[in-house]
């Protein structure tokens, strides 16, 4: 079936490598940027319930969004569930440095959702959420705990982009 397509678009270079490793002809595969930049953000009014009580709403200090996923970790596979706290050291050090140096708040956020398959279809937090949640737990044991917030909701793409639009800066590995 794969060979019958005249064009296959690909977002992650590793996907091409995986296809090639399994013997697929990738001559019709074209690597492209993630199309998320084309999504329209939700309005400030629409995101209000999702940012209530967060540093984004309070605006006491600049707020930096921080998105982390398995692809950003030093050792894969990206979909592991057994991350050790030691594997987050460089991110912890980076966030501590940013908070100290620039007197900002950090909002940790997952960038993707998952779902339970039909017939019981239900959106759920994606595989990236436990990663940012673990980073949050680690940071809660540091002197900057009060400057770190975990965005723990389940957000659709429009709401996600609306939230991101309200960060003063976004740091993302994706």
Walk through the language-model features, giving the residues of each.
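Active-site anion-handling motifs in enzyme catalytic cores
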Residues: 1-174
